[in-house]
Amino acid sequence: NHFDICVTSPPYWDILNMKRSADQKNTVNYSEKVNDMGNITDYSEFINTLSNLFTLVNKVLKKGGYCIVNVMDIRKKSNFYPLHSDLATALQKVGFIYDDLIIWDRQADYNNMRPLGYPYKFRINKVHEYLLIFIKE
């Protein structure tokens, strides 16, 4: 019980290893290491790994301490992964109180409102992220 707050933005699963469809920029990942969470290919395993990590965070936070997590939901082809809600559920299971949710409008940062997937399938370009706010009991 050493820290008052943890502010983090974990990898958005293995999204940095994927081809970028919105802007066609090259992919840039953190590493090729097998223990890099950004290289986990199975979504359930990724959520479980984050859950294990936040169990450790919970142990070092002081009672009443905050854990703030910046995440974004993910789409891979036709599959949608609600990372923010899956992670919120996982953190509650390891003992955090889900205190608040802030939707962070990043439109000015992304500044790219063209539809994704066109002309194949219309997809809305996500220009927001989430700040999940938890308190240690």
Question: Where does each model-flagged region fall?
Answer:
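Class I S-adenosyl-L-methionine-dependent methyltransferase catalytic core
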Residues: N1-E137
